[in-house]
């Protein structure tokens, strides 16, 4: 089968390979995602894979990039209202491994991040996407501060790192200790951390403290 010349067709086929790769990683782990296994999962031949990617490393990196870019896009979309911390809360709560779909995403993410320390390409992709997420969170905190929704005296740069560290930690421990970190606990911990940054609401006369 010849390689399509239409750029959109090429990208569509690469996306199909990427999706098959993610399914393979989910079933067999990243080490089990051989070219043969990926081809079998997607209904391709190994020759077809060679039309669209130079090697297995490029296929795996493409699949990992797809996961991270999708995460960034979803968080950005959820932060359409940049002035409230509740929008940030909702954006991150939706991504915790509290459902079968999000849990699968975290399992794949964990498989890829295991390669970050020893692989420059994976490290570059990871750093770039996390830089984008930090910008989104920082912009939310800055906008909340301008709107008067952020508590006074908050070190925003430090809070960005703290929020994302908690987010990653909850996701990781939810995979490793699912009984100790069930969905309700994941959400409660993250919600508590973000709401602690909110400016206290003025107490109305007659309202209990």
Where are these regions (language model features)?
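Hydrophobic/aromatic-rich alpha-helical bundle segments in the mid-to-C-terminal region
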Residues: 6, 121-127, 131, 145-209
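Helix-turn-helix
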Residues: 16, 20-58, 62
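Hydrophobic alpha-helical connector segments
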Residues: 62, 76-105, 156-163, 187, ...
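Amphipathic alpha-helical segments used for helix-helix packing
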Residues: 87, 100-123
